[in-house]
Amino acid sequence: VPVAPPRRWWLPLLWLLMIVSLAAGLGLRQPQPPDEPRFVLAARAMVDSGQWLLPHRGRELYAEKPPVFMWLQAAAHQAVGSWQASFLLPSLLAALLTLWLVADLARRLGSPRHARYALAALFCTLQFALMAKRAQIDMVLVALTTASLWGLLRHLAERPNLPALWLAGIAAGVGTVTKGVGFLPLLLVLPWLGWRVYLRRRGQPVPGPHPASLLCLLPAFLLGLAVWLAPLGWALLHTPDDALRAYAHELLFKQTGTRYANAWHHRQPPWYYLQVMLTLWLPGSLLLP
């Protein structure tokens, strides 16, 4: 009769399975179009030229995405020394960080049993595994937004924790300059404030930190934005270059503002995300009522 491993080994064995599964194939394939080759070429140009502030594709500035993800790829290459082995590392490490944050939050707000279930559920989600094995910005964005939610919930739902709150703001700021939607986790404060108002009107005790503590999210968020916007602003002020101004206008206004207000591509019908949830969130979507 097979003997089950002791309960204390379940979590280490699960982590070993996840690391081996997500890292499988690392260094065995080339970047695949459409996005991976562009990011790798921009990161390679940073390493070759020593100019990391602005990503280039050939001689032209690459203004479609901020450089944060390409910085991570270039840093991974500096550590590993091989583009084929390093271009997927940021996504892999971001996936592992996301898994740890989810498990830790489930343990803090629930129990070790909840942590195991949350960890296994996220790891088994089809879209999560796909993004973890692609050199795209999305997995890094997920890690940053999860870090922001982790910090917010530790402060709001566990106990007052200003360092965690600062981390939430900084992660949201870095997420925003990584891909524009990184600020979304901060909107969690709106239903939390509404819940406090509801309890107060019913004459019930209002647990949690004082709302004034949330004011530190603003400087923390600006600090996260400054990771890239500060050196970009300095370059704009001290370098009278029309190409640099055109790059900043293209990225900050067209690629960000215009995409929000009037997207010119990736148009989808209203039910698009329902379709994504039902298919790419398998097998967890089978549990939907």
Where are these regions (language model features)?
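Transmembrane-helix signature of polytopic, membrane-embedded enzymes
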Residues: 11-12, 102-124
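Extracytosolic helix-loop segments that constitute the early lumenal/periplasmic catalytic or substrate-binding loops
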Residues: 20-23, 38-61, 68, 75
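Short acidic/glycine- and proline-prone juxtamembrane loop motifs at membrane-interface regions
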Residues: 88, 133-141, 181
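Loop-to-helix entry region of an early transmembrane alpha helix in multi-pass inner-membrane enzymes
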Residues: 67, 71, 80-97, 135
